[in-house]
Amino acid sequence: MMSVEAIGCEGRKSPKHRVKEMDLATAIEETTVALNLFLNNKFSEARAIFEPWSHASIYHALGHGTISYLQAVMTFDPTDIQEAIKWIKNSIEVANRFRKKTSVMTSMSKMMWKTNYNTYTDEEVHAELCYAESLLERAILSFIQDDNLINFIKGGLKIRNGYHSYKSCVQMFENRTWPSARSKQQFESGVKFGSGTFNLCISMLPKRILKLLEFVGFSGNRIKGLTDLERASKLPCLRSPMCSMVIISYHSIGTYVFGTADGDIELARQILEPCLKNYPKGVIFLFLAARIEEISGNLDEAIDKFQECIASQQEWRQFHHLCYWELMWCHAYKLDWPMAAQYANKLCEESRWSKAIYHHQQASFLAMHLPRTDACIQNINDIYAKVPELKQRIAGKSIPMEKFAVNKAKKHLIHGTENSLVGLELIYIWNGFSILAKKKELLEPVLLLTEATLQQLKKTKGSASRSSGCYWDDYSLAMLLKGITLRYLSRPSQAELCFQEVISNERDLHYDHYLVPYATLELGLLYLQYDRLQEAKTFLTQCRHHNKKYMLENRLHFKMHAALDNLKTKMTQSSEIPAQDSLNLEGEDEERTGPEEDGLEMSIASEASQDSLDKDGPIDGPGTNLKNKDQDSLTGDGSVDGPMNKVGPTEDEIARTNDKEDQDLSSGPR
């Protein structure tokens, strides 16, 4: 029984809220009711259930922390994040009070004998579960506060504590005699929810982050995570809608932001369907429904659903900003630059997340709209001029995307935006081309725009010096964007030439040095797409070891990590790879030993096996080049040179390739 006096939200004992004992089953039932209210947009009513018990009941404390956490991760609003951290810390403290107390002698005995979990009460095992879940939420908040290295390490350290708590929960679930089948089912749901979310989060982190956390002793298994979450989503338990939410978010958002956009859209639709029946006006599931339409390339349907999402509630105003953000991109994908700029302006006026980023986006979208009058150009410059002074510092650190916005704004103020595809550049760095790729009719106008811009740039080439100005920056950006568009249009040879030309321009770039490692990444992704696996491995690892600092490096590493995982799977499945060979995809110069963990398994063989960190054997793949012999395969002699050794194609080579390949698109003005 939980027999602690309830304490008011300010931390004082409140006579008004003095309550009697509450049993675990009632606490879970009330938390389920409150969560359902929250998911049906009754936010104040949900908090009214949680608050009187938030300092006394493990599930009320967890529930209050969880709805605050959901508001934070859905909006990224700094105030919401701080509020969520406050309530999650409270949840950790409350759960810790109800956990099984261990003495020094008990701790020593664990080293010699297995723990007898039958001595734990139901409250104590559920307190351990709530403690682990709160630590996981706190860790994820560390990641979303800022994507710099320090926050990743802090988040990893917090996950470490939650990881060990989840290990204990797995043992409790398997080795305890449960007096109540319902309590056991609720516990199983919680373990699978935490295990699945944990594995998904860790599986998306780049290796460079995991290596710095080597002493933590864990790794993530994506397949295991998704399996656990899908199983738990089907249980009639408190955490079922949360499991569904994580799965849908992973496939519709996570894989697009942190990976290579390989989410299972149909699975997301299937899991979303019963959620929409249970919460037909629930803002979170309406948003996810709109997001699924967006990533499917159904932009008009997505716009309608985001508008429906906004109209569904007025209490949680910050959630409107998230919808404005997606509406801005939907219009940008349609090349409707005035509407995209309009939504960017709404974010400038209403949202507090990053006004520097919003202003940069607004000016960049306006710069894409033609024709531009002198007054329009002056307005664009005025907006760009505000960006540097709006940059924030959080804990002494700048937000990487804000640094990018500031650097680009300064460049455009000096050199202007004529013939600079600033709007398409934003679509690319925010991973929008994977959405454009879903519909050919979305890609064709982009190809025409890039080719027209390249033609205009070539007209100014004679007056531009290779040692000054930003001609080569603008030219290389347009060439990179053209290559990406061609890759998605299944014209690989042309795309390959575009990426190689960007790489060959490295010494001529003055501002946008990030273009070369990103072109290297895109070349690796192209080879991966067409099963030229050895070349894919070479270029994916080369972009990891790029010898210069550049903007948006962390974003590249997330995409590269996801691509290397896909490459590893393909190479393992390839008949040309001997079964006994293992793969070193992180570079042959690294010596890595020890077993690889399989993620957080429901059965944990031994403590020792959990203390190693995702370590592949130092064995290279075979040295032969893998080629696709089909008609649509990439051309070339199979040689694999580094970016610094590549010689870019000439304009004649590109022209000959253009004539040779598909002629279903107009090539734009010549």
Language-model-detected regions and their locations in the chain:
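Generic marker of "main functional regions" within proteins
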Residues: 48, 98, 105-108, 144-146, ...
